[in-house]
Amino acid sequence: MANHKSAIKRHRQSVERAGRNRAARTRVKNAIKQVRTAITGSDKAQAGEALVAATSVLSKAASKGAMHWKKAARKISRLARAVNSIEAQ
């Protein structure tokens, strides 16, 4: 355990941040799952709504530093491409 006051504070802050980041990553995973479920159900309208929600969640996670912004952009791009491919099938 840390002995210095500043080290104790840094540890406390890192634990709080880890919890926040874990919650943000969980929200991202759940949002992506909803989009994937709508895609497998071939429901274009529901998939579109889920994509909008997932885009918001991913962008927020990236802006808060829970994930890299390029990773968020890549996931949004791939989800959008998958939703747009529903029509083509």
UniProtKB/Swiss-Prot annotation:
Region span, Disordered: 1-26
GO cellular component, one term: small ribosomal subunit
Comp. bias (Basic residues): 1-12
Keywords: Ribonucleoprotein, Ribosomal protein, RNA-binding, rRNA-binding
Protein name: Small ribosomal subunit protein bS20
Pfam families: Ribosomal_S20p
NCBIfam families with a match to the protein in the record: S20
Function comment: Binds directly to 16S ribosomal RNA.
Keyword Transmembrane helix recorded: no
GO molecular function term, any single one: structural constituent of ribosome
A biological process term (GO) from this entry: translation
Gene of this entry: rpsT
The family this protein is said to belong to: Belongs to the bacterial ribosomal protein bS20 family.
